[in-house]
Structure formats: C-alpha cells, structure tokens
C-alpha cells in the first residue's frame, strides 16, 4: 500500500470513529434533554406582596443598565399613583446599586426573620453589596451564587410592592434562566447602546427571553447622543439610531431614547440620582416618560 493510500485509509477510519463518538454523545444528550423536558419546568413561586416583577437586562456590560434600573425605579415611584417600588440587585460579582442609591446599611430582619429592604429616596433596595464589606470580593461558584440569589429574592420581606425592578448582570447566563423559571416575571426591558457590537447582543437577549416565555416590554437606547454644554451641538458618539432600527427589526417597542448627560454620571457617582438631584432636567423628563410607558402597560 502506498503512503498516500495509507494516509487516506487512516484518515477515513479516524473520521468515522469521531463521527460515531459524537453522534453517540449527541443521541445521549438528546434523550436526556427529552427526559428533562417531559418533567417540565420547576414550578414558579410567587413573591408575596409583589405585583409586578420587571427585569432590566443587557446583552453586554457597559451600556448603563444599572443607571437605567435606578432611575426607572425612582421615576415609577414618582408617578401620580405613588407606586411602591423596590430594586433587587442580582449582579452578585459587581453590585453597583448601593453606590448609586447611597445605601450602606445591612438589611435588618423583620418579625418573620426575613430581610427588610434598605430604603432611600422612597425606594427599597436589596443587594449583595449590602451583605458583604465594600472591599470584599465575592469569589463563588454557581451553586453558592444561586443560593445567595434565592436568599435575597425569597428571604426578603418585600411588603406591598407594586413594582420590583430587578437589575440583572449582563449576558444570558444562569442567573437570567433561574430568575425567569423560579418566579413570575411580568416583563423584561433590554438596554443597549447604538453601536453594532452592542446591538448584536440584543438579538441574543431577546431570543433568550422568547425561549423562556418572558414578555419583552421593549428596548431602551442608552447613550444615544451627547449634547455639548457650551455650543449645544449634538454628537452621536456611538452611531445614530442603531437601537431604534433594531427594535423595528425585532418587532419590539422602543421605550426610551436616553442621551449621554453629564448629570447622569455625576449624580450616579454621588449617590443622588438625577430624578432626585435634578427632577426638572431634560434627562429626568425622559425617564418620567419611560416610567409612564411601563406603568400604562397591562402586565
């Protein structure tokens, strides 16, 4: 047998071995998946006293999702109906809600041994940032993370809450899957910036919620433009109308078009959100209109 024929013979047999190996594994995985699907999803537990649960999510980090979550919560709380609102920060490894909301105290325990949300500006907050020291890193594996999330979710006395705003970590991982399968979610808001790299992840986020049967309330285009404070020239630093076009493509509603405003940065860093520090500013009015769209929907 020639060297060329020998190589062909071995390549053919090795290829067939791999095909048999992987097709065998695929068959096993397929059967396992079918068995799990027959069992059905875990039964969802209601959150006592909570009427609406809204997830604030993003396909990638750095799009201002937590800023959107904080200011939306405050804007809903300031609607004429005087809704009772709380924020749950589920970003275990990088919680930012305590800084933005200027809350530092550990939650107290109520008579039922459940945590009481730490309240500021009329909005209750629960976050991992309130349960560990500020300089302490959370270095946990999946099961511990899920345990902590369940503790914050079901181990908190939410009282009579009209809207629970859940600030989720970026991406489409276990935390999103767990929240959507264990509690009744009223809807999800997806946050994106206009540039293509962020929009590409929006599709994944919307697809994830569609697969989990979670209603997507709409898309928020954040950091859409920058208005110069000296000459009032508007600059689209990350492209123009990218998220708006994405919303049209996906058939979902564009809930808000939020500009880059220095007030949002300074107010967030100081722990006095713009809805509190500058309630009559143009960007605060954008959030009020956004909140009105959420509250006017039948959830």
Language model: regions and residue ranges:
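Extreme N-terminal, non-catalytic leader segments
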Residues: 2-59, 106
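Helical mechanochemical/support elements of P-loop NTPase systems and associated helical scaffolds
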Residues: 46-49, 68, 72, 93, ...
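Walker A/P-loop phosphate-binding motif and the immediately C-terminal alpha-helix
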Residues: 52-92, 206
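Phosphate-binding loop that captures ATP/GTP phosphates
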Residues: 80-140, 146-154, 158
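Glycine-rich phosphate-binding loops of nucleotide-dependent enzymes
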Residues: 126, 168, 181, 289
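Conserved catalytic-core segment of NTP-binding enzymes
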Residues: 162-163, 169-267
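C-terminal boundary of histidine-terminating zinc-finger modules
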Residues: 270-281
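Short, hydrophobic alpha-helical segments
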Residues: 291-299
């Amino acid at each position: 047998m020639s060297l060329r024929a020998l190589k062909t013979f071995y390549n053919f047999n090795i290829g067939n071995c791999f095909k048999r190996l992987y097709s065998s594994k695929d068959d096993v995985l397929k059967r396992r998946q079918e068995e799990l699907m027959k069992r059905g999803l875990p039964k969802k537990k209601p959150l006592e006293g909570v009427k609406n649960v809204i997830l604030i999510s993003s396909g990638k980090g750095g799009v201002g999702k937590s800023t959107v979550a904080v200011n939306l919560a405050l804007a809903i709380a300031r609607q004429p109906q005087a809704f009772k609102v709380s924020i749950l920060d589920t970003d275990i490894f990088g919680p930012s809600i305590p800084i933005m909301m200027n809350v530092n105290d550990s939650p107290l325990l109520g008579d039922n041994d459940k945590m009481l949300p730490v309240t500021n500006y009329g909005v209750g907050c629960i976050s991992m940032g309130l349960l560990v020291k500020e300089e302490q890193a959370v270095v946990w594996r999946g099961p511990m993370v899920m345990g902590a999330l369940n503790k914050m979710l079901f181990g908190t006395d939410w009282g009579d809450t009209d809207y629970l705003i859940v600030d989720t970590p970026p991406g489409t991982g276990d935390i999103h899957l767990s929240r959507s399968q264990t509690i009744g979610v009223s809807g999800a808001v997806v946050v994106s910036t206009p540039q293509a790299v962020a929009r590409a992840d929006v599709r994944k986020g919307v697809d994830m919620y569609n697969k989990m049967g979670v209603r997507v309330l709409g898309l928020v285009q954040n950091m859409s433009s920058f208005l110069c404070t000296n000459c009032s020239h508007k600059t689209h630093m990350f492209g123009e109308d990218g998220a708006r076009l994405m919303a049209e493509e996906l058939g979902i509603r564009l809930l808000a078009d939020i500009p880059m405003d220095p007030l949002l940065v300074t107010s967030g860093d100081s722990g006095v959100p713009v809805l509190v520090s500058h309630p009559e500013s143009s960007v605060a009015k954008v959030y009020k209109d956004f909140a009105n769209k959420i509250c006017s929907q039948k959830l």
